[in-house]
Amino acid sequence: MRKGAFAACLLISSGALCAAAEAQTCAAPEFLNTMVMEPVAGSDLMTVPVTVNGKQKKFLISTSEPITMVSQAMVRDLGLPETTYMAGARELNVRGSHSADDARTRVRVAELGLGTQKGSGLQFLVSDDRELGNAKPYDGLLSSDLFSNYDVDLDFGARRLNYFGPNHCPGNVVYWSQRPIAVIPITLMGSKINVPVTIDGQKINAVIDTGATRTSMRRDIAELTFGLKADTPSMMPAGDLRDGHGATVYSHAFQLLSLEGVDVKNPTILIQTNAMVRNRDSGMSLESRAQRTEPRPPDLTIGMDLLHQLHVYIASGEKKLYVTAAGTGETEVFKAVVAPAGR
């Protein structure tokens, strides 16, 4: 079989269709890059290894943040020079080429390595989170500015972050599974991936956030849509967790969260008024982002406590999410794509 037809067959879930695929002229997604995910101890969060000026570092995968950022600790460690001058400055994409960005206070990076790709002459925003790189055991956030122009394959079962080209036949992406597949329309609001979900029979909107440790629901949705009431057996305080205004954060065990037929059973979800952040002192806290210039938190934020149970393919060109239950380990078809490239 010709190499191109073989690649097309790899991206079709039924082997019986390979003969038909060879005759088709539509393209399968182009495999671009892969990185091995590494779990953050004590949570379901995932980092990927990167190199910054030749030094090994770890970046947290954060799909809801708009801009890739580096920690103040890494800036000090590597002696990265600060800059506000952006003329001619460029950012890395997964092919190793670059794109212009708006002027912001940043640091200069001579070389950044992501998987098999490297870029040079880069600038990155420095995070104002002083715990990044210290109490938080990663050195930066790998965010949506490096995702939006590509298909992103989050294979949590195999612990792989894969990049594919966005130009392909609609639906011709699920190479990994015979398991039930959910095809979900996505709406991008800023950097956030919004999807419809069903919880206990009620349809609400959700944001996919790989940077969130826990899945959380806005309190008014819990009370008005699901009839929950604070300080009752069905909505008890989540330990001593409080938001930025000192209000109690609650939790509730729902029966079923469904993504177009791919189900997560008995999810325990935090219930809060304000968006989830980390407390700078210790543990988790919540801080209000419902300010005049910012929208309210989403109805539901799906965090890594649930996402790690799934295989999620973000098809940016189609504006669709392809989701199955997570597998165990790398699939044979993925190995066939990666091994010849020496990745």
Model segments located where?
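Positively charged n-region of N-terminal signal peptides that target proteins for export
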Residues: M1-G4
